């Protein structure tokens, strides 16, 4: 138990007089400073803890940094003042956070931004014209916004049963909370607008709007939605369009990617319009090859090329534009009489004659034997064939039949052998289908053709053909 004497009260009154002599400008400048040094914080704690009892009106303007819970629990033994019991409940630190001021609700009302909020105490958050200090950590434009690392919670517990704060008991606190929320919302909206002005990507960025900055945000959104960014892309490079993690406006934005210009001899190619269509996907990188139109046939309107990707791509969107190939246009082929010829068939007289490769012919198959009789000129492979042919011109018949009483003579030996079969009746050529036999091979060949056409011919024709095959009976050989 501690008892404070007259000396302690006198010391407190002296400090209170020193504090009252300070000008109000220094107090307001103290409140508006974002970062306080340790020495000034200790001085403020000591001065406010001793001077808040006697001058309550001054306390309302400038609330102490440390609440009354830092004092001793035996304050009721001191000679009290009439203003002690009239102190409102929001000056005390309750043993729990008030129900009408939840940190999660305040954080949800704020616009999403990559910032970290640090709350020093509950009493600082209730100041009407002072916003909590912000520590902005600028990240890369691809990273997603992070949630606040700290939340406003009560860490100083007091044994006194303080009345719960509400709109009736603490009107100043309710008004300060509303002002704090409005200031935080304005500050975050302003940060979003500044980030959108600095880093406007290929896709348009439309930050959240607020009533106080409607004109500024509308101008940024209007410029970003109407802009088409033109990139001059060489054939060996790649255009990388990075997207901002801020919310994208509902209407789809277009990116204009122009292929490299062609030389003076060719026709300049038409630009390619690339349009991103929102599509939920897990892959953050979308790679697309844009085929360029042939320069020989430039279209009247640029054909739009549609790509499918995520709504807000977290990675890079690559547009690979190939270098257009200049095709040398050939003049149409015109015939000598002036008519245009079709390119399918070669023009007569203009196509170069290809060298014909003659296959090598066997020397044994060359008709080197030519008949020397005037007006004939026939050629043969063998000399024996040429000799038999010359006998037709001379009339020589060296082969004679040896059958008794037969004096026939032949120019060729095969003709003599065939004639001899007529005397003997020999039929050495037999049909494999009907076992019929023939003296000559050509007769057997003719008979085989009838078997192939037997199904097509009627019976009476077959019979007639058989009658034609009947040969005359050979004359019997005279007996000697």
UniProtKB/Swiss-Prot annotation:
PTM notes: Ubiquitinated; mediated by SIAH1 and leading to its subsequent proteasomal degradation.
Induction remarks: By TGFB1 and BMP2.
Source species taxonomy: Eukaryota, Metazoa, Chordata, Craniata, Vertebrata
Entry annotated with the keyword Heme: no
SUPFAM superfamilies the record matches: beta-beta-alpha zinc fingers
Stated name of the protein: Krueppel-like factor 10
Chief location of this protein within or outside the cell: nucleus
Gene3D superfamilies according to UniProt: Classic Zinc Finger (3.30.160.60)
CDD domains: KLF10_N
Keywords, ordered alphabetically: Biological rhythms, DNA-binding, Metal-binding, Nucleus, Phosphoprotein, Repeat, Repressor, Transcription, Transcription regulation, Ubl conjugation, Zinc, Zinc-finger
Gene Ontology cellular component annotations, sorted alphabetically: chromatin; nucleus
Source domain of life: Eukaryota
Similarity comment: Belongs to the Sp1 C2H2-type zinc-finger protein family.
Organism: Homo sapiens
């Amino acid at each position: 138990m501690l008892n404070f004497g007259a000396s302690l009260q006198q010391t407190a009154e002296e400090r209170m007089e020193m504090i009252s002599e300070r000008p109000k400008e220094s107090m307001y400048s103290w409140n508006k400073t974002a970062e306080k040094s340790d020495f000034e914080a200790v001085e403020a704690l000591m001065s406010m803890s001793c001077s808040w009892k006697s001058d309550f009106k001054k306390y309302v303007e400038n609330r102490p940094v440390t609440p009354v819970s830092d004092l001793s629990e035996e304050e009721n033994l001191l000679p009290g003042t009439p203003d002690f019991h009239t102190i409102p409940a929001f000056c005390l630190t309750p043993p729990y956070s008030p129900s009408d001021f939840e940190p999660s609700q305040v954080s949800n009302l704020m616009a999403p931004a990559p910032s970290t909020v640090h709350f020093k105490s509950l009493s600082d958050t209730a100041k009407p014209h002072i916003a909590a200090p912000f520590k902005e950590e600028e990240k890369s434009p691809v990273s997603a916004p992070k949630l606040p690392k700290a939340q406003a919670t009560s860490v100083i517990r007091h044994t006194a049963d303080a009345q719960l704060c509400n709109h009736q008991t603490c009107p100043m606190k309710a008004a300060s909370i509303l002002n704090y929320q409005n200031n935080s919302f304005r500050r975050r909206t302003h940060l979003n607008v500044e980030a959108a002005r600095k880093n406007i990507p290929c896709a348009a960025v439309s930050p959240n709007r607020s009533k106080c900055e409607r004109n500024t945000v509308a101008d940024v959104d209007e410029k970003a939605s109407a802009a088409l960014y033109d990139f001059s892309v060489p054939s060996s490079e790649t255009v990388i369009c990075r997207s901002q993690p801020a919310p994208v406006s509902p209407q789809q934005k277009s990116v204009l990617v122009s292929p490299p210009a062609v030389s003076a001899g060719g026709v300049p190619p038409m630009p390619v319009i690339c349009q991103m269509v929102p599509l939920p996907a897990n892959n953050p990188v979308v790679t697309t090859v844009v085929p360029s139109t042939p320069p020989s046939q430039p279209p009247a309107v640029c054909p739009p090329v549609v790509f499918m990707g995520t709504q807000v791509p977290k990675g890079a969107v690559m547009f690979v534009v190939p270098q257009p190939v200049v095709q040398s246009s050939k003049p149409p082929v015109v015939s000598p009489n002036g008519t245009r010829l079709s390119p399918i068939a070669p023009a007569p007289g203009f196509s170069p004659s290809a060298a014909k490769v003659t296959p090598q012919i066997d020397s044994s198959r060359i008709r080197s034997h030519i008949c020397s009789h005037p007006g004939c000129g026939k050629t043969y492979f063998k000399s024996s064939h040429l000799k038999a042919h010359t006998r037709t011109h001379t009339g020589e018949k060296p082969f004679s039949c040896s059958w008794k009483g037969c004096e026939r003579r032949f120019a060729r030996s095969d003709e003599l052998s065939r004639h001899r079969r007529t005397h003997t009746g020999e039929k050495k050529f037999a049909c494999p289908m009907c076992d019929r036999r023939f003296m000559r091979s050509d007769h057997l060949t003719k008979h085989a053709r009838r078997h192939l056409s037997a199904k097509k011919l009627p019976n009476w024709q077959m019979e007639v053909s058989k009658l034609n095959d009947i040969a005359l009976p050979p004359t019997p050989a005279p007996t000697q």
